[in-house]
């Protein structure tokens, strides 16, 4: 009879460890052995005995009923039937009882020899190919050479059948009768048995020392790496020594999972649907049994070997069918789903069942708008509410004595009798519901509402919640969930209620902003109209003004004077006379008086600021009421205003025809220039595109002027646009201007989208011609396709971000770091992208900040920078502030509140336990989806702003140049000018009086300069201009040109133009690396002055032998302009940065400051040598096809690119250090989002970047337990170095019994030992100081970082499940359940917010319960006192 035990796992465990299962453990957890491949009897539908569904092993199929039916009912619980051997118990044990299969021969576990890195292979030092040939019974392996060692046969040698038999023949007779542990015995085996023996014989410590020695001393880098890889596996086994033995990677007993987890369901028609696992198990059992029989009947070796191989393969398929080249397929040619497959992927155990479960007490329905709802309310259909709150209703029915039993109460609820409705009303009071709209992209995708019962079957949603849910009412559905426990209800009410979530956690701006109709109504009544009825009247107060309006004496738009309540500069409410309108008076009736009098026209933008102010001044509760008032007024006025629009409101400007004609004329001129041969085809194209872009933008401007002055700006279309209710300038332009340039169709794999040079001149009001329509359909369709594809990408980005940062939680108040980031205005050339105010607001200052002129303390170090302080700092001359940042936070786990700063969703300092990592990931991911969904609105219109190609003085100033090298020329107008030939030239505009630098500009190579250093210039003076369409190469000397290596069809091709017959020489990539195209400039006597390399793609515009003057252009390299700028470029860019990928054409970057000299040409690469002042020399190879950006004798700074291309984050990290790369990534990603007009606070990006920089790579392990090149956590690294700090390493143990060479001992132990030896006159122990490890900071992409987390559960549920579990098992890892995902998987509360471990003991209840408990407590106390 199989043995039974009750081993129920407790659910309050605090960690999970994973390891290899030993055969004993598998037996221990098994309830019996499965002997037969049968599943169930096809006639009786009862499980076969000893089969895969056997009731003896796994438990009964029906509750409390044995197989033969002798014992039925619960009273026999626990009895084992004497006839059929089935224990009488409940049927759910079939979900937890395991079985096992005892294999006749051991089998290797596929995870450990088929997945990379090959664990068994690394341990034994055998390559995968050889290992496979042993495991699959093709070769013998020598386990112990014994007497044959002198014949040159060594351990681990592979033998073929013949060789093996030869050796057996030549062995001494008695050899095979020796004991296995006799060193003379020759042993060779094949299959997993052989591997088992080899693994069992390993001495890990000796192997470890040998490999460490090899890794330290081997000259060949490849062998060194090999040794390090093997070391990692060896070290894993040494570290987990108690739990894991290498030979357990060979399976002797296969566990059988419980039958309910691999069900067999009868379908109608006598067929069965079965889980694939049953098939896989059956194959294993059949082959195992056949092998048993064959061994019993002493079958020949060949047959046995074949059968063993088949057994190995069947177990492989069972464990991981997708890894095998020949996966087991079903009849329908579908690979069977093995055990590994059921863990992997979106449908696997982790993501399908552990991280996302379906829940009870939920409902879903279509949503409709509920304009009469208050903030924080929602309408729930009666039927839905009755079903959701059913248990609560039943309880009340019984309490009120309406029914006696639960069953009858249930019936009443199901029949929906009248009595339940008022009970339901009562139950719903103070019991909020959660509404959720998929996709839940950020935390505002689930909010709590107080439900109201409504008729109908649709859920009513508050219109202001739409933005947060990204919902509209075109058929969206939402899910409703009911929080059940007191704790959950409390959290829903306090933390998740809609009216408490007015601010967007991504940027702190209000998210419940009225949109569309509401904005339009408010805009309409706050707009003024000159000449309206009652203009210029004066009223003594708002009441009088309203009476006059109601009596029809004054128009709602008329400018009038009214005495209203406003707030003066000290914040007191005073009565003042304001020039305003009745509409504005009506609006201000709703605005809380503390917020002042709003006397502007209200658009969506200004409304957002007003709401922000109201929240700041009056708090969230008042703000919610204010929002409700605004909503009602907006809807009412949009209705009263009758704001429809008709075709006549779309006005086409009269100037359109002349503008278009002007465009045609200019294009004609450009084409003439081209035909005359003045410009190349590419330039012609760029200029044409430029002309049309200009025409389009000019037309847009005229159109805006026209439409905004129509009917004093009361044109409906203009009102919609201007208020921000609907539509954009783009769309209006296409309706009544011209559609403009469109992107060209793009072939797969071609260069980015070119632009069609004939624009669409019609607009939608005039209608498009067939051709125009056809061109524009392409853009529109591309938009739709992009949207569909990019949504998935954005979702995947969010998933990776959450995975990398889910364990970042605020763990402490202050980590006490002294470091921070220096913040300044973020500028691009001279326009401020982000002001200092925005960047420091809500952060914590590192130092005291003192006003430089007045000397007052603005903010103390370690204090929050509030709005007032930030404003003062912005207005003062202070240019940079050092703030605390999560990038520099030194908290051991998570981050500290001071380094994070203000929680944007509440505008207060962040609290301990806030899950800032997840908030950051959502804040970055959510707009990612928005961005991608935004492509198609412009209908594929090519949005490219005309390239600006000059520097013009913005104000009068003095010029200062840096690194300027020029050549004097005469420009095309005949004026004297200079051409810049230095690559690093910069011009600074300096204020003449104060000497403050106003702005700094880069002066590009090849630009024409019209001023000199130190000049005073007036505002509007042209400083420099350059060719925006071409990069150029300019000669710096006068002389004769001679080409070298310029060979037709080898290094250049000729493109002749059909239209003009002009021929152009274009440099191409040469197959022959010895031929390097270059241009020499020679003197009259033929002496070489300069040489210029000709880069690939350059158009040579000078003939061979031609004379050139200094400053002339010899090569033009067309820049790729006129690409359609889509976020399609944006999302991949964000991914590229977060994954820390190197761009496709990385620039070569100088690592030191120094002087440049050009070296020789080696294999198609030019050598560039940088020599620093200290004499350090660095050599770089730059492919000749690239343009080299430095010249002989230039002085370059570290980090300067030497060739064109993008700088890689890895280079920035290596050269400029961690801070620089962190700022680089944050700013680069911010740029992508800014381009789309999406505001996200820097701190969110900082959290992700912090997670990317968690690890260091060991350079020199010293005496620590690390290996060279190992990647470890920064913290772990510091702890390990602290551990050996001050300790000694034994060099020579002398006569000591207790110490070995290489042992690490404390100074005290050493002193004791040595004094003992000294007393006995023995040789003392010699030591040296322990050497600490050194490391380099590395930057990991978010995917790498997520897979490298300390929690294996989190990593396994992210990606590469099998690989992660595999590694974790070998290392015997323990998961301490510190992050979020691990805890969700284990069904625990997450360790953040109210789930923090210190709140575990708190119980939420009512006052009555508390009093009752206290009363009981008193009686007990009295009882004790009586004693």
UniProtKB/Swiss-Prot annotation:
GO MF, any single term = magnesium ion binding
Binding residues annotated for Zn(2+) 2, in chain numbering: 815, 889, 896, 899
Q: Where along this sequence does the record place binding of Zn(2+) 1?
A: 66, 68, 81, 84
The residues that hold Mg(2+) are: 472, 474, 476
EC top class, as a word = transferase
Family annotation (Gene3D superfamilies):
1.10.132.30, 1.10.150.390, 1.10.1790.20, 1.10.40.90, 2.40.40.20, 2.40.50.100, RNA polymerase II, clamp domain, RNA polymerase Rpb1, domain 3
The record's listing under SUPFAM superfamilies reads: beta and beta-prime subunits of DNA dependent RNA-polymerase
Share an example GO biological-process annotation for this protein: DNA-templated transcription
Which EC number(s) does UniProt give?
2.7.7.6
Q: Which UniProt keywords apply?
A: DNA-directed RNA polymerase, Magnesium, Metal-binding, Nucleotidyltransferase, Transcription, Transferase, Zinc
Reaction equation(s) it catalyzes: RNA(n) + a ribonucleoside 5'-triphosphate = RNA(n+1) + diphosphate
What are the required cofactors? Mg(2+); Zn(2+)
According to its UniProt entry, the function of this protein is described as:
DNA-dependent RNA polymerase catalyzes the transcription of DNA into RNA using the four ribonucleoside triphosphates as substrates.
Subunit structure, interactors included = The RNAP catalytic core consists of 2 alpha, 1 beta, 1 beta' and 1 omega subunit. When a sigma factor is associated with the core the holoenzyme is formed, which can initiate transcription.
Query: What HAMAP family does the database record attribute to this sequence?
Result: RNApol_bact_RpoC (MF_01322)
Regarding protein family, the annotation reads:
Belongs to the RNA polymerase beta' chain family.
Instruction: Tell me the protein's name.
Output: DNA-directed RNA polymerase subunit beta'
- Please state the gene responsible for encoding this protein: rpoC
